[in-house]
């Protein structure tokens, strides 16, 4: 009988234990090691061209989605800076305004990598360039275009965007345009 009471008492003590899980330090260290030895990237970083000036830019710890101090602190290797243009009118004036917006964003990204942060970040257009830049301790900027609207009716603009470093382009973004319908259903009430 004493054995049964002993077993029941032991079970009761087990049930009364603090059930908070203690973090497995070795597991956290392993995760951190993986993070530090793997190429980490953020595939969508919106930008504001007002944050790409001599006095205010992404080499500073700004209240932005990403910047160099945040990339360093979070061990982020690659930021895909986005050349986004909201959908406007499908007119010559609309295309001109959109093209100016897109060009301003391309220019801002190039100022970051060529002037303000040239010793800390560089533009990559291939995975080999990403690897090479990581090996020398630089952060990496890549460029994506959200909304093909700014290229207007001149498909040759795609090649120019490519030459400026863009490596992907979505056809539409939050609105129908000259290339594609979007999910917003402006014309078909869907």
Task: Identify what each model region corresponds to.
Residues 4-13:
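Sec-dependent N-terminal signal peptides
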Residues 16-188:
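N-terminal hydrophobic targeting/anchoring segments and the immediately downstream early-domain regions
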